[in-house]
Swiss-Prot record:
GO cellular component labels: plasma membrane
Protein species of origin: Klebsiella pneumoniae
Official protein name in the record: Citrate-proton symporter
Residue intervals on the Cytoplasmic side: 1-41, 94-114, 159-177, 221-251, 311-318, 362-379, 433-444
Localisation: Cell inner membrane
Pfam families given in the database record: MFS_1 (PF07690)
């Protein structure tokens, strides 16, 4: 009898151990696959926050406005490479697998990070300085074009049934962790270094940290396992067939791009551009602007999985439409309140509200985008739609916001840009879910 009881006890605990092991394996996979996403966003946020110092170092001009515009133009140029990277690297990932492809994107991304740390100033090497910065941004844009799509699809393919929204939200969640780390480092530098030291060389320290963690991220990525869904698929399209399938489904790609427009505009407005907006437009201290950005990233980190989980429960369409309508109704009025009464608390309140809208919308949008693409070109299709939106909307949000304020005199005018992106997202959502019964086409 004791033996029988022990046997029954062992058999009853075996499923629990298996579930715990499977859960631990999925958590490990999430950490490994999102590590590269962390590096990408860490670097992009730093470039946005230290834009004034980068402008001074690499893009000297007759006026601060012109210098800053050139810096943000180079920042945006990297996004123009994203659609090319999405097609080329996205097709490669769809052909050879998620694991191999994501190691390649990380390698290219790391090269761009190394460049920004090592390039001497304009006064030292002249025109080579801005040219090399541009090359670094183009390389990072090329790799980022497929990095985000590859990570999102990987998470969608390892998700447990009915929890795809929750799982894919951690792609964007890793970006928020990157912003938290970058903002915390910037806050610490402001506390220990004089402004002149930060302007001369101190701004490079966070970028150096990014370089130092690259080997550890490579180790994590190499331990990734291929998804069962990709392995089980018997037919993998050749590169030419991937391009043909994307062309056959161009309407889905364009509608997907418009759906992403809302999320990428909101994200770059409240994170990448916000520190510069706080310092240069609202005249808040650099430390206050950084602290607001840090708290906004924490807010994003909370709302992203909530949005994903709610979309699992109530459907993607409901969450997407609700958030686009909220953005359309409140983006400009909220920024007008901030412009009329600029303070740390007001900036924090307004950006936390926009963070709620962004987090809820993006939590539903990422799984929706993985679901509307044909399985054979899921990474390439997702990446192309996302990259086009980032190139047209998100990447140029800082420069468009700067130009709108300069030429209209309205400090709240970035709200017009976000409202326009919300209209795009609303129309795309209605279109995609109205045509959900239409068969997607695969080129054979």
């Amino acid at each position: 009898m004791p033996t029988a009881r022990c046997s029954m006890r062992a058999s009853s605990t075996a499923p629990v151990r298996m579930m715990a092991t499977a859960g631990g394996a999925r958590i490990g996979a999430i950490l490994r696959v999102t590590s590269g996403n962390f590096l990408e966003q860490f670097d992009f946020f730093l470039f946005g926050f230290y834009a004034t110092y980068i402008a001074h170092t690499f893009f000297p001009a007759s006026s601060e406005f012109a210098s800053l515009m050139m810096t943000f133009a180079v920042f945006g140029a990297g996004f123009l490479m994203r659609p090319i990277g999405a097609i080329v690297l996205g097709a490669y990932i769809d052909k050879v697998g998620r694991r191999k492809g994501l190691i390649v994107t990380l390698s290219i991304m790391a090269t761009g990070t190394f460049l920004i740390v090592l390039i001497p100033s304009y006064q030292t090497i002249g025109l080579w300085a801005p040219l090399l910065v541009l090359i670094g941004r183009l390389l990072q844009g090329f790799s980022a074009g497929a990095e985000l799509g590859g990570v999102s699809v990987y998470l969608a393919e390892i998700a447990t049934p009915g929890r795809k929204g929750f799982y894919t939200s951690w792609q964007s969640g890793s970006q928020q962790v990157a912003i938290m780390v970058a903002a915390a480092m910037g806050f610490a530098l402001n506390a220990v270094l004089e402004p002149s030291a930060i302007s001369d060389w101190g701004w490079r320290i966070p970028f150096l940290f990014g370089v130092l963690i690259v080997p550890f991220i490579f180790i994590l990525r190499r331990k990734l396992e291929e998804t069962q869904e990709f392995t089980a698929r018997r037919h993998h399209l050749a590169m030419r067939q991937v391009f043909a399938t994307l062309l056959a489904n161009w309407q889905v790609v364009i509608a997907g791009m418009m759906m992403v427009a809302m999320t990428t505009t909101a994200f770059y407005l409240i994170t990448v551009y916000a520190p510069t907006f706080g310092k240069k437009v609202l005249m808040l201290s650099a430390s206050d602007s950084l602290l607001v950005t840090l708290l906004v990233a924490i807010s994003n980190f909370f709302w992203l999985p909530v949005g994903g989980a709610l979309s699992d429960r109530f459907g993607r369409r409901s969450v997407l439409i609700a958030m686009t309508l909220l953005a359309l109704a409140t983006a400009w009025p909220a920024l007008t309140m901030l412009a009329n009464a600029p303070s740390f608390l007001m900036m924090l309140s307004v950006l936390l509200w926009l963070s709620f809208i962004y987090g809820m919308y993006n939590g539903a949008m990422i799984p929706a985008l993985t679901e509307i693409m044909p399985a054979e070109v899921r990474v390439a299709g997702f990446s192309l739609a996302y990259s086009l939106a980032t190139a047209v909307f998100g990447g140029f949000t800082p420069v468009i916001s700067t130009a709108l304020i300069e030429y209209t005199g309205d400090k709240a005018s970035p709200g017009y840009w976000m409202s326009f992106a919300a209209i795009c997202g609303l129309l795309a959502t209605c279109y995609l879910y109205r045509r959900s019964a239409v068969a997607l086409q695969t080129a054979r």
